[in-house]
Amino acid sequence: MQPPDPIQVRFYGKSGPWVVLLHGGPGAPGEMAPVARRLGDRFRVLEPFERASGEVPLTVARHVADLGEVLREPLREGPVRLVGFSWGAMLALAYAARRPGDIDRVVLIGCGTFDRRSREAYVARMAQRMSPDERRRIQSLEARLAVETDRGRRNALFAQLGSLYARVQSFKPLANNSEETLPCDEAGFRETWQDALSLQERGVQPAEFARIRAPVVMIHGDEDPHPGPLIHDSLARFIPDIEYRELPRCGHKPWIERWASDAFYELLTACLG
């Protein structure tokens, strides 16, 4: 059997330590580009696009293996710095646990949930934040997605849902926070997230994170509906060297926030050294 094709990677910067940025979703490539460009002034930055659905089944293990191939050359110089956003933060922890010698430090931005208590808190917070119109639109899109069979239309519906969720998860976004639009991958989201939840249900995660040797820093907005303190508590049971840093007046995606973006970049740069 032929090995799967390598994944797409974008490069930024010409000097400094290697930093790898993992996007969220799963299935939302390109959203880390503003952060990559900013860090490119001081670091050599890799922005991999996680594998899309279709060629091989998508699992956490598949994404870890793909990332290992991306890092083959940078690792010749030594361990790298790994930064993940949302789902990408969850993948960063999985990689650091399964290949601990590859990673010098880990930064988690708006990390996702690893237990039922945290997920229930997230769902409750999202419900509180949604306006009646947003709730109706989300319910309508979810109903259409449930019966749609065309891949392209499913991806379009998924992208609309993602935009609505991002709006609810933000606090005071900058007026000029438009991001480049890349195709979303609804099937990739579904396959990967099902496997991630299975790992939690079987007790594999977060227990396997006890193998992480690198220091871990969580950067979390105080207005992020993902419950940062609860997520930190679930991880700290297994990761002794984990630090929680909260940004005031900040939603899920710090770099788009009017009151938090500058503090976020300052903190992220300090964490990466």
Regions found by a protein language model. Give the residues of each.
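Conserved HGGG/HGGXW glycine-rich cap/lid loop of the alpha/beta-hydrolase fold
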Residues: D5-P57
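Active-site loop/oxyanion-hole signature of alpha/beta-hydrolase fold enzymes
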Residues: L46-W87, F264
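Conserved hydrolase catalytic core segment
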Residues: P79-Y122
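Flexible "cap/lid" loop of the alpha/beta hydrolase fold
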Residues: V107-A146
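Alpha/beta-hydrolase
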Residues: S140-A207, A214
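Short beta-strand/loop motif that positions the catalytic acidic residue
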Residues: I212, M218-H220
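Conserved alpha/beta-hydrolase "acid-adjacent" motif
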Residues: P225-I231
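Catalytic histidine-centered segment of alpha/beta-hydrolase-like enzymes
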Residues: C250-D262
